[in-house]
């Protein structure tokens, strides 16, 4: 292995190949790598000799490890190894890489042919880093890697080839290929020199590759498909690489850079010689590459085409005659190639071969081998390569020898097949364009080159004519006109349209363009040829006219119109006369008489388009050429007609023909007329037309209708004429060019006439005025005439308004009449008819109103009239039209209003912006005054709807008008002007209260009604526009000027559709929070309200008996308007922190200053000060406490409070008070200064503000009330004393409770019990009275129902003051109870004087009374409901009247003890009314007029002990037994059948008798709420019963048998399953929508707790989301209590999408908790038997039950599915010992039956199965019907024995057998049973 021979002879002047290679490489690290490979045996050769190569052992260990991993078969391992190797190579430079290169080169050659493209790409990345790091040191290896390097550039995978090209890119263009080899050889000459240097090695490498086969490609065992793919990749890349290399090396040298030619010429010459010799060798050895042409691989065939093209271009000398003969069929007959990826290289090869070797055509049968395949190729749309193949067709015609085809047949077949391929291109407009472009080029080429195919001139002409006739006329033109050979019957034409793209508009346009270009080309070539096409088309057209088939004629004319439009579009007319003189002129000349006589619509359109295209003065001579008329002079052809002659022809022929008659063709004839208008003759022609129309008087001619259509056409003509380049310069481009005195005079006379109100008159006026749309502003009358027309229209509108039945509309009319309008209200014309006429005109010309902007008065009046009529139209829905006469009267009037409403709908922002600002402002002012009049005057309309309508209309108009802020404020100010009816509480000018004394009651009530209605209007405006528009509208006068409006609204209190607390006050608060300077406004409001209350409180002396107001609910109890407004206003100010301590102190000072007038007390102030003190006392005390130690801050409040306490102490005890004395006011004042709270923290905070002296005085005042017990009779006679006493007790307990002694507590309790007991007595008497009344009328006739309900109302209406007294007592007791509970929980030293042994019995006794109140109201409603639902509603409405009282009752009922409830129930049952305690609870819960707190209380009592056991099952049933099912074995006696069990009627109707109509109700409907509550109760009751007891099993069986599963469907109407679509299931709880999270949490909580009480507690007020939560909780309870029931429902679902969503919801949110609960219960279960054990696997959700008996045993595996319990539990036998297969199968089936049918815990099912197995071992025989000892449903034993065969059966099984078989025979022996 020595050195190579010849080294010694090498001269110094000749460098070695390695040194030359090194010179080509840049220094440093600018080298990169390409794509290489291996061929034949060379793949195993190293690139260096043994002497120069580095030892493998010298490699870095890590590099060596990765190189070794490259020989692995796994592509993933290779990719990871290459990635690691790439990083290692990056870290090395220069000489460090030399040891790596030999081994890497070896691996590189193997890797470039790897099957995985990722491996090949990663290989090039490593090679890039190797060459980059090695730099010039890679030179010795260059020749060995250049072949693979070059080969790698052409990998079929683009990402791999790009990775290779990124390092070796040749930046020169060779032929059509650009190859970039940049990084390794950045200089262009070095790149070329590198290829020259290594050319021999590259050719050798490629030659070796081409010799390989799939069998010898690899030494590894690979799959055949992988081998085939690798082979195709290698061959195609080698072929393309070879073609590219030949193009580069054998190209013509570039002489522009000849400076270095001498130095490089030898190397280049050598490379060219090597290339030529190698090419000859390979061409010969591979037999012209014919085998590759026949390959099944498209990539190999495409590469072969490219290679042959390169050979033809670069080494044509290699082609011998035999080679040409061999290749001719393969290349010229190549049109069988159907793979579009090959077509580009295919066409290049075919064209080059045919051009280079034209003699090749003689070696084959052209028709058979070429043309047949070419026709097929064209018919198939070039097999998907239209963009490539169609442009090549003309080149193919050029190179195809003429003598090889028959010209007369060739071209016809060529174009037929070419155009047949259009059906394959219909999806792409680009492909269609390519097809038609090729058609045009090839056709014109055929005409120009006809001489190539013919020697004789006549033959040339005949060929050209033949082409025009057979191709242009019969194919292209026929296709364009959708005709074939002259005509296609309609039935065949329809089928023809469905083929290809004949009916495609875009295709037809392009086809027409193609025909036009061909015709233009023919005209340039020889004009005489054009006549053959024109004559053929004309003859065909005229033949159709003669045949008379109008449908075919119309279609042909439409296509001719299309062709004319294309002529105009593509500007074919420029400089060419043939379109008219040769084509259209003769055709129109002969067709005009037929068109004129037939008046075919499309024929007239054809004339119009022809005139438009060519011009009237050119077309008219053609049309009249054959008409002999004495009045017409002859016209010389081909010359424009003179204006005079044109006018004469226009007058005598075209005007009469186009304007006579009015039919379907009139529009088309008028279009023709307009097209004939010549610019020079325009004025005369238009005047002639107008005169002719108005002068026609013959019968049947409608002048106005004809003019209307004519004017619309004129409007379009104006638009068309003004859109050109000469804008507004051309005659007829401006509206005034079309004005005519006859038009104006006719329009004016029509609008002022009372008889001309026809539809045609309306349409004529609308067409004259214009303005039908926003853009239609063209009018045909002058401005003065326009004003006269609209004055006439306005007069008609005002006459209509004047006769309005609404007084406000009628009243407003007078303000709209202006002097310029001659308005005669006494006219006898039909107002409805003329108003309808005017409305229709305005509707059709609305936007022409903008032209009246200069006449502001007229336009304002017109717009205002429209506003008023439109509002009347909107108000008609509020009129009571119960009388038929009223309906009839309004019917015609509404018809007019509807038109005006349509006008108003057009008034948008864009319209109003076009109107003069002064007009907009005046219109707004008129509208404001009109709306004000409507609200104040219309007493008979629905008030709320009326005010809402007026406010909405005002808001809409203000938004449209876009007025300035100041003008808008002025408009709002107009609405607040004072009138006779409004305001009624405060004067706007003086802000003083208005005195209404002495006003008649009826008038006063009327004024209040109007005022409430107007406040409703203002409030609606505030809601829509914002309160700032009215409160701070006039900033010049400040806030105070508008404070009166706030006071007026506050005093009004309620109005239609709103009230102060829910509407105005929230808006005011929000405004004041956002407006820092609103303090002055609030102070002004307070001042006005306080002064008004002081003045008016004396009027409400009797209404102030009870001042203890719930500020959130019952503030309406304050009757006096100013005081009520003042209290609510102060309450909201402090509640929302708008006022604080400072403002409270200022108010305190103001009110106390008014308390005394000199030495006398102001009685009015004394009456109202308690209300104010009750609100401001808390911030006052806070202010005093925070004021520090200064005495000045302590004196005012503390001194006054002490004085008031001392003043109250000076009075006798309340029990001695007599009516008429004024001590009540002082007591109320004192009590108001000591607020109480049932919240302990607030109570302690209040107590801390009290000084010792105050507490002492307060306690003394309380104890003073215990004096003189003999006055008890007075107490019962004065309810006010009871109220004050109850409140004083509350205060004393709250503030002085720790100082109470035993007597004090006795006094408190005795009074509370007495007051509450008095209400109990009243309620019990009411219940008894209702019971007696209903019992007495139950048999009465239905006619007396109204009397019965009236009598019932008298009974339940309780006016007894004991209810109010008891309400205060309940408040006191509730407060005391809260304080005691807080003491017991927190262990605080509060109320230490009250011992538990004292409190507990008193509490129970009082709560018993409260429960009796609760049951009484329920009993009363239940008894009334037994008569009718209306009766029950009357009872329920009484509770709403005493809402606060019953809410206190409900709160205390929930807090009552089980013992108190039990005693109350017993008392009710002992009472003996017609309804019991449970019925009363259901009556409250399902009340028709429910109170949420009472409903919750009823549910709580029904769902908890001791009532829950009585709540579900009907009274006639035996109580549900708690006896264990284990005790049933001994005897069956005493076990009642489940068939006897009945649910209570209240529950049964919602469980068993559920109606499908429930699914159609609203999601918050009362029916749904009641149903869900009933089911929640039922499920909670079942869950509370002990497991495996008779009672629970009977109830469960009854539910499963009778309950309607519709409940589950209704539940999932609430649960938002749609939120589970998509990816929702994969999200965590925090990511899912909140609506779904709440429902899921409710379901999970119900499963865990076994109760839905927490969800029910938050149910009210009823909302959709809360109902969804309850639905989720009920579903969770069902899954826990009735799993088998739910599973049966789920299994019967047919909606797959819904079932999958339900399963997903259950699996995610319910199943985990259920499975955890089941496994936990099984784990805790005590089976009490050594023979039975259970083991649990929580991870696998499995339970293994092991049963052993007498050396036999069996393991049963119970597996819970992830969507348990919707999917059944799976049971398998894991192991069995000593048990027969039959018994094993039997036990397995029995376990499956028990666990799958168990409605309860699985632990219960396992326990029952264990008992079943025990019984079998004890010898108990199983039931022959169900094959089980224990029945799976009722768990009974077989006890019914057949008297004949003695077998025993379960009773349930035997009953079912009898039922299904319809005979009572033993199932076994068939003997009678």
Curated annotation (Swiss-Prot):
It is found in: Cytoplasm, Cytosol. Component of the ribosome quality control complex (RQC), composed of at least the E3 ubiquitin ligase LTN1 and NEMF. The complex probably also contains TCF25 as well as CDC48 and its ubiquitin-binding cofactors. RQC forms a stable complex with 60S ribosomal subunits. Residues 1-21 are annotated as: Disordered. This is E3 ubiquitin-protein ligase listerin. One of its GO terms (molecular function) is ubiquitin protein ligase activity. One of its GO terms (cellular component) is cytosol. Transmembrane segments: none annotated. Gene3D superfamilies: Leucine-rich Repeat Variant, Zinc/RING finger domain, C3HC4 (zinc finger). GO terms for biological process: protein ubiquitination; ribosome-associated ubiquitin-dependent protein catabolic process. Signal peptide: none annotated. Pfam families: Ltn1_1st (PF22958), LTN1_E3_ligase_6th (PF22999), UBC_like (PF23009), zf-RING_2 (PF13639). Keywords: Cytoplasm, Metal-binding, Repeat, Transferase, Ubl conjugation pathway, Zinc, Zinc-finger. It comes from the Eukaryota. Residues 1-10 have a biased composition (Basic and acidic residues). Pathway: Protein modification; protein ubiquitination. Its EC number is 2.3.2.27. Belongs to the LTN1 family. A zinc finger (RING-type) spans 1823-1870. Its main location: cytoplasm. It is an enzyme of class 2 (transferase). It catalyses: S-ubiquitinyl-[E2 ubiquitin-conjugating enzyme]-L-cysteine + [acceptor protein]-L-lysine = [E2 ubiquitin-conjugating enzyme]-L-cysteine + N(6)-ubiquitinyl-[acceptor protein]-L-lysine.
């Amino acid at each position: 292995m020595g050195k190579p021979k010849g080294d010694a002879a090498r001269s110094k002047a000749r460098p070695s190949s390695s040194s030359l290679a090194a010179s080509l490489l840049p220094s440093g690290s600018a080298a990169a790598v390409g794509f290489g490979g291996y061929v034949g045996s060379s793949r195993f050769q190293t690139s260096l000799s043994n002497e120069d190569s580095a030892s493998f052992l010298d490699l870095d260990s890590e590099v060596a490890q990765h190189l070794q991993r490259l020989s692995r078969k796994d592509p993933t391992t290779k990719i990871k190894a290459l990635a690691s190797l790439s990083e290692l190579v990056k870290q090395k430079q220069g000489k460090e890489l030399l040891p790596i290169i030999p081994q890497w080169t070896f691996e590189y050659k193997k890797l470039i042919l790897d099957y995985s493209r990722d491996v090949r790409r990663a290989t090039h990345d490593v090679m890039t880093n190797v060459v980059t790091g090695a730099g010039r040191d890679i030179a010795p290896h260059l020749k060995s890697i250049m072949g693979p390097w070059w080969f790698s550039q052409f990998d079929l995978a683009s990402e791999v080839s790009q990775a290779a090209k990124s390092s070796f890119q040749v930046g020169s263009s060779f032929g059509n290929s650009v190859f970039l080899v940049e990084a390794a050889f950045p200089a262009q000459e070095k790149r070329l020199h590198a290829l020259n240097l290594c050319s021999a090695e590259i050719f050798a490498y490629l030659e070796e590759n081409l010799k390989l086969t799939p069998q010898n490609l690899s030494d590894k065992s690979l799959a055949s498909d992988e081998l085939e793919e690798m082979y195709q990749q290698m061959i195609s890349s080698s072929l393309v690489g070879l073609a590219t290399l030949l193009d580069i090396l054998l190209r013509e040298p570039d002489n522009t850079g000849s400076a270095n030619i001498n130095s490089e010429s030898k190397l280049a010459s050598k490379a060219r010689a090597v290339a030529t010799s190698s090419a000859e060798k390979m061409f010969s050895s591979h037999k012209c590459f014919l085998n590759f042409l026949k390959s099944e691989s498209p990539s190999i065939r495409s590469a072969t085409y490219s290679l042959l093209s390169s050979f033809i271009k670069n080494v044509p000398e290699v082609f011998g005659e035999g080679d040409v003969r061999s290749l001719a069929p393969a290349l010229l007959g190549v049109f069988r190639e159907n793979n579009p990826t090959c077509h580009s290289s295919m066409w290049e090869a075919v064209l080059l071969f045919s051009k280079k070797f034209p003699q090749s055509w003689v070696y084959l049968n052209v028709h058979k081998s070429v043309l047949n395949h070419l026709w097929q190729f064209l018919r198939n749309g070039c097999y998907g390569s239209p963009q490539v193949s169609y442009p090549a067709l003309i080149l193919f015609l050029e190179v195809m020898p003429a003598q090889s085809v028959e010209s007369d047949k060739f071209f016809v077949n060529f174009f037929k097949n070419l155009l047949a391929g259009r059906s394959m291109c219909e999806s792409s407009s680009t492909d269609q364009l390519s097809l038609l472009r090729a058609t045009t080029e090839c056709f014109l080429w055929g005409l120009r080159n006809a001489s190539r195919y013919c020697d004789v001139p006549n033959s040339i002409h005949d060929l050209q004519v033949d082409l025009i006739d057979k191709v242009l006329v019969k194919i292209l033109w026929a296709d364009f006109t959708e005709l074939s050979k002259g005509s296609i019957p309609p039935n065949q034409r329809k089928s023809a349209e469905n083929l290809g793209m004949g009916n495609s508009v875009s295709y037809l346009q392009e086809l027409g363009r193609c025909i036009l270009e061909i015709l233009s080309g023919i005209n340039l070539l020889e004009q005489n040829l054009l006549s053959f096409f024109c004559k053929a088309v004309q003859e065909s057209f005229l033949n159709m006219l003669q045949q008379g088939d109008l449908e075919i004629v119309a279609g042909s004319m439409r296509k001719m119109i299309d062709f004319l439009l294309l002529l105009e579009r593509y500007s074919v007319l420029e400089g060419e006369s043939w379109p008219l003189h040769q084509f259209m002129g003769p055709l129109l000349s002969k067709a005009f008489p037929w068109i004129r006589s037939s008046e075919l619509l499309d024929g007239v359109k054809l004339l119009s388009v022809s005139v438009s295209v060519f011009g009237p003065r050119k077309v008219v001579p053609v049309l009249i050429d054959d008409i002999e008329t004495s009045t017409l002079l002859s016209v010389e052809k081909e010359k424009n007609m003179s204006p005079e002659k044109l006018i004469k022809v226009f007058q005598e022929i075209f005007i009469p023909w186009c304007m006579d008659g009015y039919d379907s063709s009139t529009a088309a004839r008028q279009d023709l007329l307009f097209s004939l208008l010549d610019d020079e003759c325009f004025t005369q022609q238009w005047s002639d037309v107008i005169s002719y129309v108005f002068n026609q008087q013959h019968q049947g001619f409608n002048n106005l209708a004809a003019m209307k259509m004519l004017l619309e056409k004129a409007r379009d003509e104006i638009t068309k004429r003004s859109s050109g380049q000469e804008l507004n310069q051309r005659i007829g481009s401006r509206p005034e060019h079309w004005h005519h005195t006859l038009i104006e005079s006719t329009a004016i006379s029509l609008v002022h006439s009372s008889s001309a109100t026809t539809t045609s008159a309306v349409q004529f006026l609308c067409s004259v005025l214009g303005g039908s749309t926003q853009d239609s502003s063209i009018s045909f009358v002058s401005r003065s005439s326009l004003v006269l027309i609209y004055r006439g229209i306005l007069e008609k509108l005002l006459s209509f308004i004047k006769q309005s039945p609404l007084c406000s509309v009628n009243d407003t009319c007078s303000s709209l009449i202006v002097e310029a309008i001659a308005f005669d209200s006494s006219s006898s014309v039909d107002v409805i008819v003329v108003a309808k006429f005017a409305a229709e005109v305005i509707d059709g010309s609305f936007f022409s109103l903008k032209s009246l902007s200069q006449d502001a008065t007229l336009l304002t009046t017109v717009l205002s009239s429209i506003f008023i009529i439109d509002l009347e139209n909107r108000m008609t829905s509020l009129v009571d039209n119960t009388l038929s006469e009223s309906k009839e009267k309004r019917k015609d009037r509404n018809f007019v209003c509807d038109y005006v409403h349509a006008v108003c709908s057009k008034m948008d922002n864009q319209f109003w912006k076009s109107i003069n600002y002064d007009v907009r402002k005046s219109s707004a002012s008129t509208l404001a005054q009109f709306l004000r009049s409507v609200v104040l005057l219309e007493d008979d309309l629905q008030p709320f709807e009326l005010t809402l309508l007026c406010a909405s209309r005002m808001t809409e108009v203000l938004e449209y008008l876009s007025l300035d802020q100041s003008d808008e404020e002025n408009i709002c100010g107009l609405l607040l002007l004072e009138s006779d009816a409004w305001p009624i509480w405060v004067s706007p000018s003086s802000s003083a209260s208005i005195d209404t004394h002495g006003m008649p009651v009826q008038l006063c009530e009327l004024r209040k009604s109007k005022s409430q209605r107007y406040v409703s209007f203002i409030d609606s405006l505030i809601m829509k526009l914002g309160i700032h528009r009215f409160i701070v509208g006039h900033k010049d006068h400040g806030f105070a000027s508008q404070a009166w409006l706030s006071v007026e609204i506050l005093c009004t209190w309620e109005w239609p559709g709103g009230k102060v607390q829910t509407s105005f006050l929230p808006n005011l608060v929000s405004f004041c929070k956002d407006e820092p300077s609103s303090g002055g406004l609030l102070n002004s409001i307070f001042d006005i309200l306080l002064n008004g209350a002081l003045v008016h409180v004396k009027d409400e002396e009797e209404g102030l008996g009870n001042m203890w107001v719930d500020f959130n609910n019952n503030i309406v109890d304050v009757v006096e308007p100013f005081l009520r407004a003042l209290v609510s206003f102060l309450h909201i100010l402090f509640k929302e922190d708008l006022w604080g301590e400072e403002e409270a102190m200022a108010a305190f000072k103001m009110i106390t200053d008014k308390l005394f007038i000199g030495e006398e007390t102001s009685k009015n102030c004394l009456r109202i000060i308690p209300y104010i003190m009750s609100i401001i006392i808390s911030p006052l005390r806070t202010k005093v406490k925070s004021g520090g130690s200064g005495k000045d801050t302590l004196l005012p409040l503390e001194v006054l409070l002490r004085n008031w306490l001392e003043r109250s102490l000076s009075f006798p005890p309340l029990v001695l008070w007599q009516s008429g004395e004024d001590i009540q006011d002082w007591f109320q004042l004192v009590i108001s200064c000591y607020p109480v709270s049932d919240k302990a923290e607030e109570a302690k905070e209040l107590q801390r503000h009290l000084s010792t002296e105050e507490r002492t005085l307060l306690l003394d005042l309380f104890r003073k009330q215990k004096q003189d017990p003999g006055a008890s009779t007075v107490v019962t006679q004065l309810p006010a004393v009871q109220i004050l006493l109850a409140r004083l007790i509350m205060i004393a307990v709250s503030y002085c409770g720790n100082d109470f002694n035993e007597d004090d507590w006795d006094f408190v309790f005795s009074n509370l019990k007495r007051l509450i007991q008095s209400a109990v007595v009243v309620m019990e008497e009411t219940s008894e009275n209702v019971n007696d009344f209903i019992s007495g009328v139950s048999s009465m006739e239905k006619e007396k129902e109204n009397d019965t309900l009236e009598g019932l109302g008298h009974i339940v209406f309780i006016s007894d003051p004991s209810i109010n007294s008891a309400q205060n007592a309940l408040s006191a007791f509730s407060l005391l109870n809260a304080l005691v509970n807080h003491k017991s929980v927190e262990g605080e030293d509060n109320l230490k004087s009250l011992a538990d042994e004292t409190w507990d019995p008193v509490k129970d006794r009082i709560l018993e009374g409260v429960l009796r109140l609760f049951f009484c109201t329920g009993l009363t409603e239940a008894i009334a409901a037994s008569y009718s639902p209306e009766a029950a509603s009357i009872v329920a409405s009484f509770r709403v009247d005493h809402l606060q009282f019953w809410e206190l009752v409900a709160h205390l009922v929930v807090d009552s003890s089980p013992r108190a409830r039990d005693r109350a129930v017993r008392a009710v049952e002992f009472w003996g009314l017609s309804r019991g305690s449970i019925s009363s609870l259901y009556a409250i819960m399902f009340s028709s007029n429910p109170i949420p707190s009472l409903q919750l209380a009823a549910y709580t009592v029904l769902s908890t002990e001791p009532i829950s056991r009585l709540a579900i099952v009907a009274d006639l049933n035996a109580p549900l037994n708690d006896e264990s099912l284990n005790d049933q074995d001994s005897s069956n006696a005493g076990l009642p059948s489940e068939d006897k069990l009945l649910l209570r009627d209240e529950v049964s109707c919602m469980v068993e008798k559920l109606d499908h109509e429930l699914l159609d109700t609203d999601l918050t409907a009362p029916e749904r709420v009641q149903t869900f509550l009933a089911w929640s109760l039922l499920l909670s009751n079942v869950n509370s019963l002990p497991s495996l007891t008779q009672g629970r099993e009977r109830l469960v069986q009854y539910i499963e048998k009778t309950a309607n599963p519709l409940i589950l469907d209704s539940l999932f109407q609430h649960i938002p399953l749609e939120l589970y679509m998509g990816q929702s299931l994969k999200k965590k709880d925090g990511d899912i929508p909140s609506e779904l999270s709440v429902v899921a949490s409710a379901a999970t909580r119900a499963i865990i707790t076994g109760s839905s009480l927490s969800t029910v507690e938050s149910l009210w007020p009823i909302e959709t989301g809360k109902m969804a939560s309850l639905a989720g909780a009920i579903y969770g309870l069902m899954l826990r209590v009735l799993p088998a029931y739910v599973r049966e429902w789920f299994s019967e679902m047919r909606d797959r999408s819904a079932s999958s969503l339900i399963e997903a919801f259950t699996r995610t949110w319910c199943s985990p908790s259920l499975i955890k609960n089941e496994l936990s219960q099984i784990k805790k279960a005590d089976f009490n038997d050594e023979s039975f054990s259970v083991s649990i696997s929580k991870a696998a959700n499995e339970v293994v039950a092991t049963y052993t008996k007498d050396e036999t045993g069996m393991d049963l595996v119970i597996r819970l599915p992830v969507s348990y319990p919707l999917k059944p539990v799976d049971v398998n036998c894991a192991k069995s010992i000593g048990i027969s297969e039959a018994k094993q199968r039997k036990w397995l089936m029995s376990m499956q039956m028990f666990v799958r049918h168990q409605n309860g815990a699985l632990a219960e099912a396992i326990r029952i199965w264990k008992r079943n197995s025990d019984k079998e071992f004890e010898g108990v025989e199983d039931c022959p019907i169900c094959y089980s000892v224990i029945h799976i449903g009722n768990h009974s034993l077989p006890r019914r024995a057949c008297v004949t065969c003695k077998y025993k059966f379960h009773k349930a099984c035997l009953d079912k057998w009898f039922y299904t078989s319809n005979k009572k025979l033993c199932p076994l022996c068939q003997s009678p049973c």
